[in-house]
């Protein structure tokens, strides 16, 4: 799927959309009826009709070739199959062990993409004196995958699961990540659990981290819960929560009776979602007050069937996605503080102060706003919110530019006595990655550190080990992001091959000795300006003509047509007629 420039702020557990995420190395089968990843959440504007030309290009093979060329070995090595079978057998029957709470009976639920099978987290809420208490349970991968084992070696080498529109490269065997370590509906699982109470002002109280036995009672979908929370979808929630359950949950339910609310009561899901949403909004408001940046994201979402690009849609983040984002950001903070309090070193996830703050200041000045010379996230977010309200048409241009100028996140050693580097974009002082161990190696590392702390055991990793892991994950992330960007361009090159000569509105997202790059607004895709690029800088608004596409080389070439004015008076920023 095309994620493009918006990924850099996705430091929470919100996962990328992508059809066939559970298909491993397979492309999306035709039996999914041209299922778009975009149907998994958010509102969509379809820019179809891009698709049949270029369909002969083997996108799936090109993704695999790119992985190999970058030095990755996505195929699992010797010993993995045997280890996987042993883990499946061991986890077939679970009983609470020492220090593991039995919370099977709580009303746990999940919200994720429609086709997701590698579910990392489930949630449950309870109204208590002073606010809403949240339990966030994360699949306990560390309890299943031994450090140094064949599966662990593969996970550490690849560092994460890679999702593209046509081929996924899982970090863990699918029998684990979509099976016995996934929190799919109706399965008993061991989990790492973060608890915290959220007050009306969004402040977090009574934090804790522990181990628990859990069961997901309702596997829900962003695409259904979002409109329901936003009051844009009619109807009520059924007793078996069919109206909000994901496609995947319904397709894989061995016994539909297991999904009924039963003794939990008819209205439990409605109350759960309302409480979770209330807490999430309070958490979000508090983070914004501290300086968290709000980017109202939209993403390109290609429809790919049997490796052929059929069309490109625009997917917009909805309220259900925001709910999960805010709860996971909070849970990651709880974990980071628990490790610090326990005197344990771990990995922190940081976004440093923007190196190109001066360019952000210049962009604000173009809109008549003065930002201070010293980076200030509160004032930056105020500026972004004002622009979103007064100039929603051009807001995507600005958001893309600022995200690019923010720079990427990275991992660093987090010693208990060190002053945290912090996460500039999330306004988080203590922050780690702990909520996606099925698909991110640093999260698995964090779980192992927690297990050792919980059982009074020596640290599984030395500070030197953690420093090396952080460096490797940062290097791998850069290489894997390059592969993703290349695949995004290949998919877009196929999709846009029939639109040569057309003019589009866009914003400059990259400017260096390597070239000038522009992201088109609708449909979202990125290419290089090869004519008239002189003098362009990140954030400049331009109109460009599509000159050439070459999926094999991942080339999309533009010619600059002109500059676009800043602000509401700039006129129509939409692409040429027909788009």
Could you tell me what each predicted segment is?
Residues 2-4, 10-13, 21, 28, ...:
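Electropositive polyanion-binding surfaces
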Residues 558-568:
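Short, compositionally biased
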């Amino acid at each position: 799927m095309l994620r493009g420039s918006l990924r850099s702020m996705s430091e929470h557990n919100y996962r990328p959309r992508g059809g066939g995420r559970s298909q491993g190395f397979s492309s999306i089968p035709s039996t999914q009826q041209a299922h778009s990843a975009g149907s998994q959440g958010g509102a969509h504007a379809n820019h179809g009709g891009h698709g049949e030309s270029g369909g002969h290009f083997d996108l799936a093979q090109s993704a695999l070739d790119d992985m190999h060329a970058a030095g990755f070995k996505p195929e699992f090595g010797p010993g993995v199959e045997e280890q996987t079978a042993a883990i499946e057998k061991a986890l077939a029957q679970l009983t609470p062990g020492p220090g593991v709470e039995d919370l099977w009976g709580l009303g746990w639920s999940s919200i994720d993409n429609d086709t997701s099978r590698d579910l990392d987290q489930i949630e449950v809420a309870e109204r208590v004196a002073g606010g809403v208490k949240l339990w966030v349970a994360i699949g306990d991968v560390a309890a299943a995958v031994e450090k140094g084992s064949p599966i662990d070696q593969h996970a550490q080498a690849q560092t994460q699961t890679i999702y593209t529109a046509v081929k996924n490269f899982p970090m863990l065997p699918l029998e684990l990540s979509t099976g016995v370590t996934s929190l799919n509906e109706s399965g008993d699982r061991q989990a790492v659990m973060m608890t915290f109470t959220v007050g009306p002002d969004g402040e977090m109280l009574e934090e804790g981290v522990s181990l628990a036995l859990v069961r997901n009672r309702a596997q829900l979908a962003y695409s259904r819960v979002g409109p329901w929370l936003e009051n844009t979808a009619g109807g009520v929630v059924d007793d078996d929560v069919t109206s909000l359950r994901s496609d995947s949950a319904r397709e894989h339910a061995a016994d539909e009776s297991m999904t009924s609310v039963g003794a939990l009561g008819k209205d439990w899901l409605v109350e759960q979602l309302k409480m979770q949403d209330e807490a999430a909004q309070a958490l979000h408001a508090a983070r914004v007050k501290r300086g968290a940046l709000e980017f109202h994201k939209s993403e390109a979402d290609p429809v790919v069937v049997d490796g052929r690009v059929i069309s490109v849609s625009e997917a917009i983040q909805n309220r259900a996605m925001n709910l999960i984002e805010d709860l996971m950001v909070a849970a990651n903070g709880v974990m980071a503080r628990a490790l610090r309090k326990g005197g344990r070193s771990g990995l922190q996830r940081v976004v440093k102060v923007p190196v190109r703050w001066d360019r952000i200041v210049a962009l604000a000045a173009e809109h008549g706003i003065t930002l201070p010379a010293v980076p200030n996230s509160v004032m930056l977010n105020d500026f972004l919110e004002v622009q979103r309200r007064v100039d929603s048409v051009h807001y995507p241009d600005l958001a893309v530019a600022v995200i690019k100028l923010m720079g990427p996140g990275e991992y660093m050693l987090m010693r208990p006595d060190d002053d945290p580097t912090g996460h500039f974009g999330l306004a988080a002082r203590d922050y780690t990655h702990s909520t996606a161990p099925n698909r991110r190696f640093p999260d698995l590392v964090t779980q192992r550190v927690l297990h050792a702390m919980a059982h009074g055991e020596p640290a599984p990793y030395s500070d030197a080990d953690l420093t090396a892991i952080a460096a490797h994950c940062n290097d791998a992330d850069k290489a894997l992001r390059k592969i993703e960007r290349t695949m995004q361009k290949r998919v877009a090159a196929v999709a846009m091959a029939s639109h040569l000569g057309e003019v589009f509105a866009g914003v400059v997202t990259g400017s260096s000795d390597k070239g000038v790059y522009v992201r088109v607004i609708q449909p979202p895709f990125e290419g290089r300006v090869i004519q008239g690029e002189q003098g362009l800088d990140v954030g400049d608004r331009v109109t460009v003509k599509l000159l050439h596409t070459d999926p094999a080389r991942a080339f999309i070439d533009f010619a600059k047509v002109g500059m676009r004015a800043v602000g509401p008076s700039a006129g129509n920023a939409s692409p040429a007629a027909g788009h």
